[in-house]
């Protein structure tokens, strides 16, 4: 995996895999009535086994790549901000994205196990993805339980993956081989990187490793599992099982993390954190989102529109995006008074586990949206037009972006997959 932006060397992670075939035209074709009812047994069937595209959806305006704010972590500008787009609140879902997305294609469970007797005649999918604008490069096997985090430190030639199997695995970016396994003696709830620091959330503590000088620190204080970590300016935030958010301030003189505060307000575990626009956003199992000022660490607003666990949060241009097990992705925008309110709700058929904002090969903004039916959808923004999806053995819990059009997914079976945007990407309708 030579993660060189120029793509000079064709290494493991930059080797383009076999992409899906481009879809045929839908002109003069009809959707199979029996397929819609879930009982078509014809192969080949002369009719379409997918819905016809709706009204034409033009391309999203080229991304401005603006951040919500130019805040920097203690190691410099963060690389985890979502891309922006030139849009306003009324652009969301303009091309029919407000309808509930219904899954119409299923992964063949026998193919996954390597023993499908039907071969090419099988009615179910024998591939890990649908869409011709990205492709699978390679698969990293080794974890025995759900992958809870993926980190690619800036400037490093190593990829780090964490799991509930109590390990962090280290992968060589050039060969794709596992070069080391850290046995931590406890389930890993999350992992992030910031500059030279690798930060790992565990039961009752946060581990901090400096991969440049091998410094090894244990940050005590959390009660229960640490589910989420994020860095804002010189502060490290940890979302914990007891509903509190612990804060440490990085001391550049001593290269240590000094306890700074404990943010109270959530009544159940804090499972998602994000920093943007001089704010900390926290999502919890109590179904709420809290907005905290980074100036004084006070809660300035509580958002209660979700009806189940708030699983993931990202900032995109001037908007906050949140997802929940209530099957929705909500888009929040600030009112004239400064408070956030829902400006658009995108509905899924299943609970939504994780969000990640990326740019495709043409610099268009795309939302990666993982659901608990073992799928990940790719949506153009702000229209929410679907352009492809990724399928997995189990739920995709972790998504991480790398340079050069690379992105990673980790699922409940322990598999980590490496994907890459195609040089020429063409949106499709599934």
UniProtKB/Swiss-Prot annotation:
Classification via PROSITE patterns: WD_REPEATS_1 (PS00678), WD_REPEATS_2 (PS50082), WD_REPEATS_REGION (PS50294), ZF_C3H1 (PS50103)
WD repeat segments: 142-183, 221-258, 265-304, 306-342, 345-389, 391-429
Zinc finger feature spans (C3H1-type): 26-52, 102-129
Molecular function terms from GO: DNA binding; zinc ion binding
Region entry Disordered, spans: 1-27, 56-90
Keywords: DNA-binding, Metal-binding, Repeat, WD repeat, Zinc, Zinc-finger
Keyword Zinc attributed: yes
Name assigned to this protein: Zinc finger CCCH domain-containing protein 48
Organism phylogeny: Eukaryota, Viridiplantae, Streptophyta, Embryophyta, Tracheophyta
């Amino acid at each position: 995996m030579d993660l060189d932006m120029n793509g000079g060397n064709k290494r493991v992670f930059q080797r383009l895999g076999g992409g899906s075939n481009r879809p045929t035209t839908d002109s003069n074709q009809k959707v199979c009535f029996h397929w819609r009812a879930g009982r078509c047994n014809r192969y080949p069937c002369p009719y379409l086994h997918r819905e016809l595209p709706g009204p034409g959806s033009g391309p999203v305006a080229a991304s401005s790549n603006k951040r919500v704010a130019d805040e920097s972590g203690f190691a410099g500008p963060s690389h985890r901000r979502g891309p922006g787009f030139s849009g306003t609140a009324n652009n969301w879902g303009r091309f029919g994205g407000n309808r509930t997305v219904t899954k119409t294609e299923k992964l063949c469970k026998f193919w996954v196990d390597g023993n499908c007797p039907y071969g090419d005649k099988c009615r179910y999918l024998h591939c890990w993805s649908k869409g011709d604008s990205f492709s699978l490069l390679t698969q990293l096997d080794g974890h025995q339980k759900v992958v809870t985090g993926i980190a690619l430190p800036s400037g490093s030639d190593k990829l780090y993956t964490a799991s509930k199997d109590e390990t962090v695995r280290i992968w060589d970016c050039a060969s794709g081989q596992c070069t080391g396994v850290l046995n931590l003696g406890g389930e890993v709830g999350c992992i992030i990187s910031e500059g030279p620091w690798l930060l790992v959330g565990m039961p009752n503590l946060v581990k901090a490793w400096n991969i440049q000088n091998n410094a090894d620190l244990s940050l005590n204080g959390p009660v229960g599992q640490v589910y989420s970590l994020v860095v804002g300016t010189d502060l490290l935030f940890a979302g914990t099982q007891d509903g509190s958010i612990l804060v440490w301030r990085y001391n550049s003189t001593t290269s240590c993390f000094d306890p700074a505060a404990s943010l109270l307000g959530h009544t159940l575990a804090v499972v998602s954190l994000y920093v943007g626009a001089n704010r900390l956003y926290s999502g919890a199992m109590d179904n709420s989102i809290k907005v905290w000022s980074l100036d004084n660490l006070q809660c300035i607003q509580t958002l209660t529109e979700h009806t189940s666990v708030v699983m993931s949060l990202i900032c995109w241009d001037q908007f906050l995006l949140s997802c929940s097990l209530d099957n929705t992705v909500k888009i929040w925008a600030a009112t004239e008074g400064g408070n956030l309110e829902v400006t658009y709700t995108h509905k899924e058929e299943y609970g939504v586990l994780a969000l990640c904002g990326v740019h495709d090969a043409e610099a268009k903004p795309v939302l990666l949206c993982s659901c608990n039916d073992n799928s990940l959808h790719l949506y153009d923004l702000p229209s929410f037009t679907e352009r492809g999806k990724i399928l997995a053995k189990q739920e995709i819990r972790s998504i991480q972006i790398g340079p050069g059009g690379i992105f990673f997914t980790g699922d409940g079976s322990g598999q980590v997959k490496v994907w890459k945007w195609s040089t020429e990407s063409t949106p499709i309708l599934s």
